[in-house]
Amino acid sequence: MKTFIHLLSVLILSVVLYACNNAHFLKEENYRNQVTEDFEQKKQALPHGDLFTVFSNPDLSVYEQEALMFLYAYMPIGDVTDYSGDYYLENVRLSGQTRTEMPWGDQIPDELFRHFVLPIRVNNENLDDSRRVFYGELKDRVKHLSMKDAILEVNHWCHEKVVYRPSDARTSSPLASVKTAYGRCGEESTFTVAALRSVGIPARQVYTPRWAHTDDNHAWVEAWADGQWYFFGACEPEPVLNLGWFNAPASRGMLMHTKVFGRYTGPEEIMLETPNYTEINVIDNYAPTAKATVTVTDTEGHPVSGAKVEFKIYNYAEFYTVATKYTDAEGKAFLTAGKGDMLVWASRDGKFGYAKLSFGKEDALKLSLDKKEGESYTLPMDIVPPVEGANLPEVTPEQRAENDHRMAQEDSIRNAYVATMMTDEQAKEWVNGLYGNILQPETMKDKLAAFLVASRGNHQTLKDFLSAIRKEKKHISWEEMRGMWLLENISAKDLRDVTLDVLNDHLKNTSDGEKTDTDLVKRALLNPRIANEMLTPYKKVLYDAISEAVLKSAPVDAAHDAKALIEWCRKEIKIDNELNSQQIPVSPMGVWKSRVADEKSRDIFFVAAARSIGIPAWIDEVTGKVQYASDGLSPQDVNFETSQSTQPRTGMLKASYTPIRSLSDPKYYSHFTISKFKNGTFQLLNYDEGDVDMGGGATWSNLLKNGVKLDEGYYMMVTGTRLASGAVLSNTTFFTIEPDKTTTVDLVMRESKDQVQ
């Protein structure tokens, strides 16, 4: 009898396993066919590099094959080239595990699981092994809870790990945020979404790209439970859902949206569909809204189809694009937004037109493409944001007291980990122990100690790097000096997540630059940092590969080699911006392997390749132009369209300013910005604190009073006075910069006689 029962159990288990292995991940046939078609197109677009070998695994079940197919069909280019198929297979299996091990696994609709649990990517972060790590830490903590309580509990766990602190624009991976113990709101929300997905709870990052009433932005989290979406502040636990410090400002928001992985057909308004994601509008969850339709015509009144329509919010002294749509056959595009003012900008074939649109007051706007490059004029505009109307859920005093108590406990847990990081005293002691009195001046010791402190939980990587290059005991070697310069030139965030193989590759495989310590060599040759990409090792491999495949010899003449590299990039790298619609940088090795990139990743690749063969190269931080230097010549602009490099033709811009009360020296981003015309729209010039040697960033007095060089072209300057109500008095000036000439404009800060500024 026991034998029979055992055999029956084995048979039942076999049947279950067979059924599971042959169950569809994509259960709806029409959707499965669409994904299959998209996947085949992706394979055709990326024919090089053996990027799809995981599908040759004979052990893949039908479920696993379809889940992988869904991921690969909609991944950005870099996710295909820079991570292995085995990595994605592990994550498919881990996500499937939550459906059987978590009590809510069978409650989640397939569509929500597909788009909000399975995907690893949340936004533009570096991918890591957080799903496996987080599941191991969280599963026993939440498996006996309801879904809503589990969401709250995961957020408490996140607060144990990470708190808010501003940082640069590159988004840390979830595990890097844990190692650092802090992150900006975009990193906190990326981390929290990853944590929720790790235990099988559908989650998404929601963000307002710009507030309308104040110069800032914010990102938070929505999670799904029991049939609906709830919001909360990432790493900011509250006693209940739908509560955060941002309830009030969100009620004044004009747009909240999220990027959903793949083709998504949920109930929300679709703002944009790309080969990678579907962007949806969730503003209705937070604020009163209104819908408006924009009709774009030519100068004769005929509708223009395919026109680009940008919806812009005034913020940080620019009109920032928060939504982009394209007109249909009738020349129409629509948007649902909070009840305030936006600037609507339409363009097609180099022509453009614009007007203010007041959502809630106007439900239609007609725009004529009647503007063209070269016209000089000034346009004042009053911008009014939505009014506040927050709706706060009830919290009892007991709930608040319990939540405060838990947050204090979580602070102590996190602070205990932070205490394992190096203090200034410990770092200085370690540096002294390594170098004694040999390293001079003392300021260099202080710098190294500061790097160790700034590296937070990554300090062992820096210690291993510095210890390994400390070979000469009686003096500082050339390699050691270069190692110190390398650490000087990477960002503070890089110090927190850089790996030893990256540091070693860039130290050991960078040309000596004739053993000079010029700023150019440090900044544009030795430096691993190019733009906002994750740092990777590539110099040794690219030096060998480019020498053989591009130059046909070892690098000899920088000017000749640069031209050969430009020509190779033009001919051999296929540009496909749509396949990388978020512009998440593809690694230099990923571009080399696939021969496919978006323009931004192509630019990063060129700089990486040039540095690998000893040519100083960079992407200009203000204009975004790719440049290089050779043979002591002035910087050369790279033009991949013609394979030519040229010296930029520049003119001078000066601005006069008559001070208004309480504002003697307007600041860039706070009071004014400058943008350059390109392809029917204007692109911001990114001046920042590092560009002007005045300590406080770019201002009228140190940028425009005596003049600043700009490339020839058509520009606009936006100024704005923010009133206490959140409204803005803006002024936009259009002007042209001609080569070797000075253009003078007025920087006008408008004032209100009636309202508080």
Where do the PLM segments sit?
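C-terminal motif of bacterial Sec signal peptides marking the signal peptidase cleavage site
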Residues: 18-19
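Secondary-structure boundary elements
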Residues: 27-180, 216, 399-401, 407-594
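Hydrophobic/aromatic-rich core segments of domains that either
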Residues: 140-146, 150-156, 165-175, 180-272, ...
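A short, amphipathic beta-strand motif
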Residues: 290-301, 331, 651-663, 754-757
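Short, ordered, surface-exposed loop/turn motifs in non-cytosolic proteins
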Residues: 291, 299-318, 339-341, 561, ...
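Short, acidic Ser/Thr/Gly-rich low-complexity loop/linker segments typical of extracellular
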Residues: 315-336, 680-704
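Structured interaction patches on ligand/partner-binding surfaces of diverse proteins
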Residues: 350-372, 722-753
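Compositionally biased low-complexity segments at domain edges in trafficked proteins
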Residues: 370-430, 658-660, 746-757
